[in-house]
């Protein structure tokens, strides 16, 4: 493998499962973080289970294992808890996945959906402020919908219905 290193939060997410092999194929050494324990011997990927407290990740190992490039696929509102760790790792650039729900859910009839928009907005603002303070380059990607590989129940059911019926009824 090359000397290029990238840290990935949310590595077991749908996007993570698709992205990690592509990173390795492109010559990156990946340090993959997940809340779940992952027992894998994928070449080019070092798995790390995120502890309940981000403080447990801020040890001396961060300072000896410099990682300049980061990708966050985890819910953006947990990312600020890991800002100190990213600084210790020597982060220089970070790509973060958020959501267009920051705009579309603020007027939702669902209280749960409505509460998502301010969480996204607050986290994006904190990312922008932290990046300005630390000089870390950042970009936020806001997809409308992420689905595929049979992992999204609603989309999977729709696809199965279309395959079975040959059409999708719209009411």
Where are these regions (language model features)?
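Active-site Tyr-X1-5-Lys
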Residues: 114-139, 151
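SDR active-site strand-loop-helix element
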Residues: 9, 33, 73, 94-100, ...
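Flexible, glycine-rich beta-alpha linker
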Residues: 139-157
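N-terminal Rossmann NAD(P)H-binding glycine-rich loop of SDR-like oxidoreductase domains
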Residues: 4-26
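A conserved pocket-lining segment of Rossmann-fold NAD(P)-dependent short-chain dehydrogenase/reductase
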Residues: 160-171
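NAD(P)-cofactor binding segment of oxidoreductase domains
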Residues: 60-106, 118-129
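Rossmann-fold cofactor-recognition segment
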Residues: 43-56, 75-76
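N-terminal Rossmann-fold cofactor-binding loop
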Residues: 32-38
């Amino acid at each position: 493998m090359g000397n290029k290193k990238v840290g990935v939060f949310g590595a077991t997410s749908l996007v993570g499962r698709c992205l990690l092999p592509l990173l390795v194929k492109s010559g990156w050494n990946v340090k993959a973080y997940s809340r779940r324990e992952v027992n894998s011997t994928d070449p080019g990927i070092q798995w790390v289970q995120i502890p309940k407290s981000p403080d447990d990740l801020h040890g001396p190992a961060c300072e000896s294992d410099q990682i300049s490039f980061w990708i966050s696929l985890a819910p953006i509102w947990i990312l600020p808890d890991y800002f100190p760790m990213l600084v210790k790792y020597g982060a220089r650039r970070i790509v973060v996945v958020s959501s267009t729900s920051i705009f579309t859910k603020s007027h939702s009839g669902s209280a749960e959906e409505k509460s998502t928009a301010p969480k996204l907005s607050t986290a994006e603002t904190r990312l922008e402020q932290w990046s300005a303070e630390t000089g870390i380059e950042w970009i936020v990607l806001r997809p409308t919908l992420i689905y595929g590989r049979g992992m999204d129940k609603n989309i999977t059911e729709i696809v199965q219905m279309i395959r079975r019926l040959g059409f999708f009824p719209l009411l």
